[in-house]
Swiss-Prot record:
Belongs to the ATPase alpha/beta chains family. Keywords: ATP synthesis, ATP-binding, Cell inner membrane, Cell membrane, CF(1), Hydrogen ion transport, Ion transport, Membrane, Nucleotide-binding, Translocase, Transport. ATP binds at G169, D170, R171, Q172, T173, G174, K175, T176. GO terms for cellular component: plasma membrane; proton-transporting ATP synthase complex. F-type ATPases have 2 components, CF(1) - the catalytic core - and CF(0) - the membrane proton channel. CF(1) has five subunits: alpha(3), beta(3), gamma(1), delta(1), epsilon(1). CF(0) has three main subunits: a(1), b(2) and c(9-12). The alpha and beta chains form an alternating ring which encloses part of the gamma chain. CF(1) is attached to CF(0) by a central stalk formed by the gamma and epsilon chains, while a peripheral stalk is formed by the delta and b chains. It holds the Pfam family ATP-synt_ab_C. This is ATP synthase subunit alpha. It comes from Rickettsia peacockii (strain Rustic). The keyword Ion transport applies. Produces ATP from ADP in the presence of a proton gradient across the membrane. The alpha chain is a regulatory subunit.
Length: 510
């Protein structure tokens, strides 16, 4: 059968019309060298700093170094899956993580992927991990309290919503315990319906043992605190790149609450290991080392993270993000590089001492050098009324105590002051995982400052406090309710409290 030229032309036209001309243009480079979680890539001329690249195996990388003829990227995963000569393609995206309430109650990795075996997270919103901190006009001053439930902190070193308060101390001095107690203490607020009272919590584990993280998750589940808590975990066995980005990812998750008129608390545990992970990455990328071999921008590493914690203005929804960074010192040396950096960035520090810890003063807070620069504005009036003189009295007690070691003959007035100081120290002690509601803290500190404990033997102070609070909860609930609702001690309430305490002390000392 002979085809006419016109028919041939028609067939060709139909075939040409069916051809899909859409071709995808991809920028592809090649891995020159790989090792220690770092890949040097050749051929990605237009790649940006902070961009995500994808290796042949599907593992992602983050570009940090832009050099003349190659780029340096950190591998966010197992570097054994990346081989020399592998193709690498640009994604033209920066790192994003899922955010929102769907993450609450879950344990996720640094990239926001669930690692608790409870299935996928149905999150509709994603945010970049690196966000610009709010400007001065967008912020307002700190004015609402974050109740930690710890007497020594809420009375002497109060923390406000939007504040950055550093928890610093040697290993095994109870830094994480303070953070976990603060999370557990938010349970009371979450039982209320008012959204403005609630604080959502984010705990970031950086470079910790998996067993430690599992222990914290178990403790929070037992206390019923996981319902409003999210845990971001980048453990010691994970790539340094993941330990480096974990705090930024978690901060973006916290900013979702801050920017939607809610309140969030984020705990970075700990930023010492974060700085070590960044140092490792920087040295492997052959960046010039500075003091203690940290790179020159290690201050900016933490300042750009902690500046994202803020109390937003009314025009921006009045939300807040409070940060509690943790730093581990070596033999109490707070003048090392990273501790001094973070002290200068934050709005105060809670200093924990191993010496106090071993003496049985727990939480082992050194009240003398701990400070809260903005939190006192957020402290409720009732706490100011009772705790105003405690810091001074404790400072005088420490001074007298050190003098009394040299001589045995003390005049009666000094002896009375030392005995009073010892009882104040005793009343500020507290068991782990037992945060107190603020109204009960106020009653306990009132008892200490008004010298009701002078007749109580020192070793019975704890027993006295437990029995007194049990009695007041059962029979004098109106006193606690009045302090809670009025947020100050009215004359009427004080009279009731005095009458109750005078009777109780008589009964107890009998």
């Amino acid at each position: 059968m002979k085809l006419k030229p016109i028919e041939v032309a028609e067939i060709l036209q139909k075939e040409i019309a069916n051809i899909n001309c859409l071709s995808e243009l991809e920028e592809v480079g090649q891995v020159i060298t790989v090792g220690d979680g770092i890949a040097q890539i050749y051929g990605l001329a237009n790649v940006k700093s902070g961009e995500v690249v994808e290796f042949k195996s599907g593992v992602k990388g983050l570009v940090l170094n832009l050099e003349n003829d190659s780029v340096g990227a950190v591998i966010m995963g197992d570097d054994n899956q990346v081989q020399q000569g592998d193709n690498v393609k640009r994604t033209k995206e920066v790192l994003e993580v899922p955010v929102g309430k769907a993450l609450l109650g879950r344990v996720v990795d640094a990239l926001g992927n669930p690692i608790d075996g409870k299935g996928d997270i149905a999150s509709k919103e994603y945010r970049h991990i690196e966000m610009k901190a709010p400007g001065i006009i967008e912020r307002t001053s700190v004015s609402e309290p974050v109740q930690t439930g710890i007497k020594a902190i809420d009375s002497l070193i109060p923390i406000g919503r939007g504040q950055r308060e550093l928890i610093i101390g040697d290993r095994q001095t109870g830094k994480t315990a303070i953070a976990v107690d603060t999370i557990i203490n938010q349970k009371q607020a979450h039982s209320l319906t008012n959204e403005s009272d609630k604080i959502y919590c984010i705990y970031v584990a950086i470079g910790q043992k998996r067993s430690s993280v599992a222990q914290i998750v178990k403790k929070l589940e037992d206390a019923g605190a996981m319902d409003y808590t999210l845990i971001v975990s980048a453990t010691a066995s994970e790539a340094a790149a993941l330990q480096f980005i974990a705090p930024y990812s978690a901060c973006s998750m916290g900013e979702y609450f801050r920017d939607n008129g809610m309140h969030a608390l984020i705990i970075y545990d700990d930023l010492s290991k974060h700085a070590v992970a960044y140092r490792q990455i920087s040295l492997l990328l052959r960046r010039p080392p500075g003091r203690e071999a940290y790179p020159g921008d290690v201050f900016y590493l933490h300042s750009r993270l902690l500046e994202r914690a803020a109390k937003m203005s009314e025009a921006k929804g009045s939300g807040s993000l409070t940060a509690l960074p943790i730093i581990e010192t070596q033999a109490g040396d707070v003048s090392a590089y990273i501790p001094t950096n973070v002290i200068s960035i934050t709005d105060g520090q809670i200093f924990l001492e191993s010496e106090l810890f071993y003496k049985g003063v727990r939480p082992a807070v050194n009240v003398g050098i701990s400070v809260s620069r903005v939190g006192s504005a957020a402290q409720i009036k009732a706490m100011k009324q009772v705790a105003g003189s405690v810091k001074l009295e404790l400072a005088q007690f420490r001074e007298l105590e050190s003098f009394s070691q040299f001589g045995s003959d003390l005049d009666p007035a000094t002896k009375v002051q030392i005995d009073h100081g010892k009882r104040l120290v005793e009343i500020l002690k507290q068991a782990q995982y037992h945060p107190f509601p603020v109204e009960e803290q106020i009653v306990s500190i009132y008892v200490g400052t008004k010298k009701y404990l002078n007749d109580v033997p020192l070793q019975q102070v704890k027993e006295f406090e437990d029995k007194m609070l049990t009695e007041i909860r059962l029979n004098k609930k109106d006193i606690l309710e009045s302090i809670k609702n009025e947020q100050c001690i009215t004359e009427e309430t004080e009279q009731k409290l005095k009458a109750f305490l005078e009777n109780f002390v008589k009964e107890f000392v009998k």
